[in-house]
Design a protein with these regions (language model features):
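Periplasmic peptidoglycan-binding/tethering modules of Gram-negative envelope proteins
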Residues: 1-91, 156, 171-175
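Glycine- and acidic-rich phosphate- and metal-coordinating loops
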Residues: 92-97
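Periplasmic OmpA-like peptidoglycan-binding domain that tethers envelope proteins to the cell wall
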Residues: 98-175
């Protein structure tokens, strides 16, 4: 059972507006090359490094400059939980990314805290963090501002796509 501190109702207008603000206002039809929505990944029969990855806008999951998950993150997290439950042998790598504002050290810590918040939510909601053979299946990585996807010359709104959490998948034995 998925635990939640919030009522089961999500305001659809708030969720949709937050989704649009997520990765630079992009919906599923404008995902970057190689990126797939969690819904698209759920439709695949198996996952591995050739499956692509999912990019979740940090503005959808977290308040600006924070690592506490927003209520509107619930749908994305439930989709990720479902994906993990459907693929118990798949290894998941959760990467936290930030924009270029703040020091490198601060951004590294913030991105780690965000990736760990995703990990902790999954753990708190009963998602197995180990594969059936007992090996780890969820890793977190802090990327800070080291891997921007849009120019770092812009203001806070222009860099929204750089604030993200990426979910990468691997089959056991894949590098």
């Amino acid at each position: 059972t998925i635990k939640t501190a919030e009522p089961d109702m999500v305001n659809p207008d708030e969720w949709y507006n937050n989704k649009l603000k997520g990765a630079g206002g992009q919906d599923d039809s404008h995902l970057p090359d190689g990126s797939k929505s969690l819904s698209q990944l759920m439709a695949q029969s198996s996952l591995g490094k050739d499956s692509g990855y999912s990019r979740l806008g940090a503005d959808l999951l977290f308040e600006y400059n924070k690592a506490v998950m927003k209520n509107s993150a619930r749908l994305s997290m439930l989709q990720l939980a479902g994906l993990m439950m459907k693929n118990p042998d798949t290894i998941f790598i959760v990467e936290g990314h930030t924009d270029s504002f703040g020091s490198e050290e601060y951004n590294a810590v913030l991105s780690l805290m965000r990736a760990n918040a995703v990990r902790q939510w999954l753990k708190d909601n009963g998602i197995a963090l180990t594969r059936p053979n007992g090996e780890c299946r969820l890793y977190i990585r802090a990327c800070g501002s080291s891997r921007p996807v849009v120019s770092i010359r812009g203001d806070r709104d222009a860099q929204a796509a750089n604030r993200r959490v990426e979910i990468h998948m691997r089959k056991p034995g894949e590098e």
